[in-house]
Amino acid sequence: MAGHYGGNLRQSTRLTIVKEKAKHPILRGVEDMWVQCGGYFANPLQPSEVLVMAQPLVSMKKDAKPDPKRKPVPGAWTRSYESESGDKGRVFTSTYGASNDIEDDGYRRLLINGCFWAVGLEDAIKADADVSFVGPYNATWRRNRGRRQNGLRPQDLAGWETPIVPLQKK
C-alpha cells in the first residue's frame, strides 16, 4: 500500500538511514538526503528490509523542521524473493524519484547504489564513486523551468553534452 503523505508542492522530505542498516551496501557513501516531491506513505510487503525512513518537512526548504503531524515512514527498501519456478531475485524500491529529487547528491547515490545491488554488483559499490550527471540535467518538476521537448528520439540524446532531457524552446 502506498499513497501521498503530506502537502504536495508545499512539503519536502528528509530521508534518513535506518541506523541498524547503515552497513548495507546500498548505503555506502550515502548521506544527507533531501527530496522535493512531497511525502509518500508506504507499507512495504514482508519480508522487506527498510533502509531509509522518510520524514515530511513543514516546507520546501532543505533545512525545514519535521512536520509534527507526520511520523517517519519507509522511504526506501529492498526485498528478496523466489519465484514459483525457483528463480531468485531481489529488488530495491524508493517512493521518491521526481526529476528534482535526483538533483540531491545523496539521494542520487542511493538510487545508483540500489541499481548496482539489485543486479548483484554490490562489490562494485564504492562510497566515493562519482555520481555526477554526465551532461547538463534539466529537472522540471515544480520549478517552472519549462516543459520537456516532445517527440524526442534516442538519437537526439546521443552526445555526452546533450541535456538530460532538453527543454522546449520558448
Listing of model-derived features with the role each one plays in the protein:
Residues 59-60, 64-170:
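Extracellular ligand-binding/catalytic regions of CAZymes and related secreted enzymes
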